[in-house]
From Swiss-Prot:
Family stated for the protein in its record: Belongs to the cysteine synthase/cystathionine beta-synthase family.
Lineage of producing organism: Bacteria, Bacillati, Actinomycetota, Actinomycetes, Mycobacteriales
Species this chain originates from: Mycobacterium tuberculosis (strain ATCC 25618 / H37Rv)
This protein's encoding gene: cysK1
Superkingdom of the organism of origin: Bacteria
Name of this chain's protein: O-acetylserine sulfhydrylase
Role played: Catalyzes the conversion of O-acetylserine (OAS) to cysteine through the elimination of acetate and addition of hydrogen sulfide.
């Protein structure tokens, strides 16, 4: 029988699909890795289970432990799902600028949510979590931005999936940077096997911290945290592309209407960057894998779908 023992065993093994109708001007092939096929509909499901499993194995979590994490949404949703399946209490801090759907999903999974000022960005959510952690020794903070289990799970799952599903023919990987775990873990594996492979990081033009600019507010939820995350190995990144807010929103809408892919704003940003790379003459005939981190349904209340609101 092929029966999962709990929902966490269904995380990973997400598919690749070729983009065909939004690729005007591209001379390279673009295939999208659809991370919304994970049970809680985002790439963060991978680290949600990985960080808690690592903590369990290290004896850092007990039955009365309270999982506490600052999140822009998707990691919190993943942790809330895993905590529900494992029986842990979950408390999350999140900037108030994150979508209404994110808040409702977190609470639907049974998590307790503490909102922090939007102007403070992820730094504010992190500071609040650190403050709370000092008040009760039962709190355990996975610390996604610096937890080695984050890139590790991408080494053993995401990277292997990309390599296997492209028969090792992947030439370029494009991924947005939130924690940096995805691009770091995948690059660590694929660059070792194929040194010619290139990795492109994507960040908001309105908060180009990785590019050496100043942090700023932006609507591309899930990337552009406003600081360089410790998990990110910048030596593995060959290029950083900044994407404008409207470009990200417009391409995310196009993915829904022209490819049938209902995805979030950061997926639009990653695809903008992938298209830019795919249009370069030197990349003719190459295979580009772009990571689409999450599902569009959790953005229905945001500017992404304002044009279809009643």
């Amino acid at each position: 029988m092929s029966i999962a023992e709990d929902i966490t065993q269904l995380i990973g093994r997400t598919p690749l699909v070729r983009l065909r109708r939004v690729t005007d001007g591209a001379v390279a092939d673009i295939v999208a890795k659809l991370e919304f096929f994970n049970p809680a509909n985002s790439v963060k499901d991978r680290i949600g289970v990985a960080m808690l499993q690592a903590a369990e194995q290290a004896g850092l979590i007990k039955p009365d432990t309270i999982i506490l994490e600052p999140t822009s949404g998707n990691t919190g949703i993943a942790l809330a799902m895993v905590c529900a399946a494992r029986g842990y209490r979950c408390v999350l801090t999140m900037p108030e600028t994150m979508s209404l759907e994110r808040r409702m999903l977190l609470r639907a999974y049974g998590a307790e949510l503490i909102l922090t000022p939007g102007a403070d960005g992820m730094s504010g959510a992190i500071a609040k979590a650190e403050e709370l952690a000092k008040t009760d020794q039962r709190y355990f903070v996975p610390q996604q931005f610096e937890n080695p289990a984050n890139p590790a799970i991408h080494r053993v799952t995401t990277a292997e999936e990309v390599w296997r599903d492209t028969d090792g023919k992947v030439d370029i990987v494009v991924a947005g940077v939130g924690t940096g775990g995805t691009i770091t873990g995948v690059a660590q594996v694929i660059k070792e096997r194929k040194p010619s492979a290139r990795f492109v990081a994507v960040e908001p033009a309105a908060s180009p911290v990785l590019s050496g600019g100043q942090k700023g507010p932006h609507p591309i939820q899930g990337i552009g945290a406003g600081f360089v995350p410790p998990v990110l190995d910048q030596d593995l990144v060959d290029e950083i592309i900044t994407v404008g807010n409207e470009d990200a929103l417009n391409v995310a809408r196009r993915l829904a209407r022209e490819e049938g892919l209902l995805v979030g704003i950061s997926s639009g940003a990653a695809t903008v960057a992938a298209l830019q790379v795919a249009r370069r003459p030197e990349n003719a005939g190459k295979l580009i894998v772009v990571v689409l981190p999450d599902f569009g349904e959790r953005y229905l209340s945001t500017p992404l779908f304002a044009d279809v609101a009643d």
